[in-house]
Design a protein with these regions (language model features):
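A conserved beta-strand-loop-helix scaffold within acyl/acetyltransferase catalytic domains
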Residues: 201-259
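Conserved beta-hairpin
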Residues: 29-35, 39-54, 58-88, 220-237
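Conserved acetyl-CoA-binding loop-helix of GNAT-fold acetyltransferases
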Residues: 114-124, 257, 263-280, 299-304
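Conserved active-site alpha-helix within GNAT-family acetyltransferase domains
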Residues: 141-154, 292-311
Length: 318
């Protein structure tokens, strides 16, 4: 569909912001209050801009081997029967051999669309890439009705001040968070991950090592900490301020305990220490984060720490 840059873009921003607000988890509406609509509008504005800006050209340039025009990579407004979607082609691997359609906005929560033809028709709009899967986000309070879906990543959140005020987590007195002066720990961090991959090979590809650039950005925001257990280095926890799935919060980029500290149920204590620091800076802050479906230990830790599942990204095959 052709979009007229001024009038149509503003109309789409309003339309898809309304959809996102209607579909938002009730807890987020309570936590964010009047600010939520502003959060959603800012996020939606960035999405709609991808329909008309030149970012697709830059993306296409990095994937020259696919020999497709830049327009094929743009965010698209797609209408199928009574449904409207903002969707874009994406790839699950750097070689672009695993294409999928990413839904970023929808008039109806995609997981409630029981008619399998709709997702097939949506995939057909990107037929030049031959996608076999569609990925979408849906709030946890909305039941999944579409057949053949499974969770890719869980999205959990909690009000930081409430997490900090919970009864002391086991081992809390043993855990200290210290802000590092630099990223001198990075090599040790990577080594810790590589050892964990050996112990739990199923998480390789699902849980990634963060780049120095990403952790430096967390450090710049004052949200990077080294974890000490009993006075000894035991890992890191890092976060950033950002909007994810329409919810503005302090997003947990990383939480990693080394082999010596894992298995002692200290994860909730790390969460509680971080929540206290975040709440001290902003009493209205939400602590958010994604957890891969295969990372069951981290999911259990997050829920024990007081985070609740407010949504998830799902896969559906076509």
């Amino acid at each position: 569909m052709t979009i007229t840059p001024d009038r149509d873009v503003v109309s789409l921003e309003r339309e898809f912001s309304d959809y996102a607000f209607e579909q938002m988890h009730p807890l987020v509406k309570v936590w964010r209050g009047d600010q939520l609509k502003t959060d959603i509008r800012e996020a939606t504005t960035r999405l709609v801009a991808l329909i008309v800006d030149d970012a697709a050209g830059k993306y296409a340039e990095t994937l020259k081997g696919l020999a497709q025009l830049p327009e094929q990579f743009k965010m698209r407004l797609i209408e199928i029967e009574r449904y409207r979607f903002l969707a874009q082609i994406d790839f699950a691997d750097p070689s672009a051999s695993l294409p999928f359609v990413a839904i970023f906005g929808a008039s109806t929560p995609p997981g409630t669309i029981a008619d399998a033809r709709v997702v097939r028709w949506l995939a057909d709009k990107f037929a030049v890439f031959a996608p076999r899967r569609i990925r979408f986000y849906q709030s946890a309070h909305v039941p999944i009705e579409a057949a053949g879906t499974h969770v890719d990543q869980h999205f959990l959140a909690g009000l930081a001040r409430e997490m900090a005020a919970r009864p002391s987590a086991p081992g809390l007195a043993r855990v200290i968070l210290q802000r590092p002066t630099d990223l001198g720990f990075y090599r040790r961090y990577v080594e810790t991950y590589n050892l964990m991959y050996l112990e739990r090979p199923q998480i390789r590809g699902e849980v990634r090592i963060e780049t120095e650039e990403t952790l430096a950005a967390c450090h710049a925001e004052g949200l990077l900490y080294e974890i000490e257990v009993d006075g000894t280095w035991a890992g890191i926890v890092a976060a950033r301020h950002q909007v994810v799935a329409g919810a503005r919060g302090t997003y947990m980029v990383e939480i990693l305990l080394n082999g010596a500290a894992r298995g002692q149920r200290l994860g909730p204590a790390v969460h509680q220490r971080l929540a206290a620091k975040v709440a001290a800076a902003d009493s209205s802050a939400i602590l958010t984060g994604t957890i891969a479906a295969v990372n069951v230990p981290s999911l259990k830790t997050a829920t024990r720490a007081g985070r609740v599942e407010i949504g998830a990204w799902h896969w559906i095959s076509v």
